Amino acid sequence: MLNPGALGVNLVVEELETETKFLIKQVECIDEHHANKALEELMPLLKLQHPNLSLYHEMFIMWNNEISSLFLCLVMDYYSQGTFQNIMENKRKLKAVVDTEWMHTMLSQVLDAIEYLHKLNIVHRNLKPSNIVLVNSGYCKLQDMSSQALMTHEAKWNVRAEEDPCQKSWMAPEALKFSFSTKSDIWSLGCIILDMATCSFLNDTEAMQLRKAIRHHPGSLKPILKTMEEKQIPGTDVYYLLLPFMLHINPSDRLAIKDVMQVTFMSNSFKSSSVALNMQRQKVPIFITDVLLEGNMANILDVMQNFSSRPEVQLRAINKLLTMPEDQLGLPWPTELLEEVISIIKQHGRILDILLSTCSLLLRVLGQALAKDPEAEIPRSSLIISFLMDTLRSHPNSERLVNVVYNVLAIISSQGQISEELEEEGLFQLAQENLEHFQEDRDICLSILSLLWSLLVDVVTVDKEPLEQLSGMVTWVLATHPEDVEIAEAGCAVLWLLSLLGCIKESQFEQVVVLLLRSIQLCPGRVLLVNNAFRGLASLAKVSELVAFRIVVLEEGSSGLHLIQDIYKLYKDDPEVVENLCMLLAHLTSYKEILPEMESGGIKDLVQVIRGRFTSSLELISYADEILQVLEANAQPGLQEDQLEPPAGQEAPLQGEPLFRP
């Protein structure tokens, strides 16, 4: 005879022919009606088939003449390896933590068995450590499933509770009032998990008092969870989520078994179990994810790691970080932290929403860190750059994603040293394709132009072919957005840098000149634009007489020379603008055919004034002297304005509406 259970006596018997041992549970019944009702409820259990359920082999009713009582006898397999209760008792004596791998293995089997029962709408009703038997060191089974009729025998329960108060401590609050459901099994399972997690620091009495306390005071659980965290009990992060929702006083607020399995097996420590592998295809419920993500940034990152394969968890985690107050983000983030987040997100590179949120987070983290400290070093590892480029390629039609990625790249490139790496990643060709696809989208165009401006400043060696194609698209963008000041400013800078690299084709020269002059006229007050436009014009005029002719020649009352004089009046106290202006004029004077036009346009007088104002700028004086020397040497009667022809072999500029007014 074994120790009696809550409802009856347990006998170990042996079959004479096979010498096979069985366990017979004898449950005393009130009367024949009570016995028959319990038997009727339990008969369907004979048909159950699950590897982690100790099934009933036979059920019968017998009369005991000695005590004049009727008994329901339940025959099941006998296992001599002990139960979970024996394991917990041994661990308590040693004050030892339950082996993590063993616990994961056993818990996966228990959960799988309970899920099987609950899918059939069968309630175990009697879950506790002593009813989880060990077949061997890595294999367990649930036993002693009960019926409503047996579990609602109040008089018997009261007697047993007085004999052994521990028996009822595993039961849910509503089960003590004889109301059972699948959610009462969840409570009992939560108590078992709690017992396994605390056996190293709570003795039997303390553990039982805790189980009783949480029925009436849910707050009793929090100090224990805190202690588990302090003692670094393995799996505490999962217990923090599971136990409050399994041990909720209101049954309807408790997790269902499938939710318990999802939370448990989707953490990284459970991925090796067969049940866990099956669970990878299921989604984590939103409310569970939200509870997981409560807390500080470190907690959120732990969740991202533990549920790295779950896209729905990653999306909510990233969005949580996006909305987190700045003082909680822990800025600036080191490169290692960014790489950790990106490594997780790379698993979900096909999911647009995740990529969009992640790139938005990068934009926020990098942008705010730079705003706090302009001298702060921006993370720009190969992993980060590769991720951003892969993201651009993965969803080339998403306006929002493309725009955000280029903004992030612009921040990273603001400190230089990545032009070569981005060139190797094919950035210039990709930028050309994106400009072509989104040339009507002002924000995307501006983001791309701003990035190119930053990159081309320190580019060393380049393959000219993609940049030559890129220059054509830049001119198209400027022509598409003729009144946009910011696009004009960024576009002028890019065209200047491309001209320095020799990446503007001769067939594009005239169009580029028109766009640069038009941009100056559109935005004369933007000093960056004016400087870069003058530099671009000077760079092109240095190599092309056609460019020089196009700048100088009158066209229906308009001339670039008049615009140059107007800009000087506006910036006569700015030596940088005046120096770039003189550099352009110096290159123009290298073409003899246009010298008369420059003379008649008042350039000589203008340069003389400039030379007198900027006596301390050696570079500027050098340009001025060069211009004056050429103009004075050629001060002779020349062609009249109406006789001036374009250089040999070149077509005259197209006639049309005047671009510039004197």
Curated annotation (Swiss-Prot):
Record-level Gene Ontology MF annotations: ATP binding; protein kinase activity
SUPFAM superfamilies, alphabetized: ARM repeat, Protein kinase-like (PK-like)
Domain Protein kinase: 1-202
Any matching Pfam family: Pkinase
Primary gene name: Stkld1
Free-text note regarding domains: The protein kinase domain is predicted to be catalytically inactive.
Positions bound to ATP: 2-10, 25
InterPro entries, alphabetized: ARM-like, ARM-type_fold, Kinase-like_dom_sf, Prot_kinase_dom
Region (Disordered): 639-662
Organism, as annotated: Mus musculus
Name used for this protein in its record: Serine/threonine kinase-like domain-containing protein STKLD1
Protein family according to the UniProt entry: Belongs to the protein kinase superfamily. Ser/Thr protein kinase family. STKL subfamily.
The entry's keywords: ATP-binding, Nucleotide-binding
Residues annotated as signal peptide: none
PANTHER family attached to this UniProt entry: SERINE/THREONINE PROTEIN KINASE (PTHR24363), SERINE_THREONINE KINASE-LIKE DOMAIN-CONTAINING PROTEIN STKLD1 (PTHR24363:SF5)
Entry annotated with the keyword Transmembrane: no
